[in-house]
Amino acid sequence: MARVTVEDCLDNVDNRFQLVMVATQRSRQLARGSRDAQLPWENDKPTVMALREIAAGLVDRSILNEAVEPPAAKPRPEREFND
């Protein structure tokens, strides 16, 4: 796998500060499971996947206008209490 560089990502966002904001928002979406990845995972962490998507031009600054979604709820197993 090729390494993702800041320069690759800066072709699709205005500056480094905006890159941090966009990558943060996208990696949170991926980590929480609220959005599906647009590229194959290749055993990457959500942060690396977010940067790969930005470098590929699949994610841009419009993601900052989206609301932050809570994590996908996992059902809790019911516990039995014995008296």
UniProtKB/Swiss-Prot annotation:
Organism lineage: Bacteria, Pseudomonadati, Pseudomonadota, Gammaproteobacteria, Oceanospirillales
GO CC, one annotated term: DNA-directed RNA polymerase complex
NCBIfam families (alphabetical): rpoZ
Catalytic activity from the UniProt record: RNA(n) + a ribonucleoside 5'-triphosphate = RNA(n+1) + diphosphate
Organism whose genome encodes this protein: Chromohalobacter salexigens (strain ATCC BAA-138 / DSM 3043 / CIP 106854 / NCIMB 13768 / 1H11)
GO molecular function: DNA binding; DNA-directed RNA polymerase activity
HAMAP family: RNApol_bact_RpoZ
The protein's name in its UniProt record: DNA-directed RNA polymerase subunit omega
UniProt cross-references to Gene3D superfamilies, sorted A to Z: 3.90.940.10
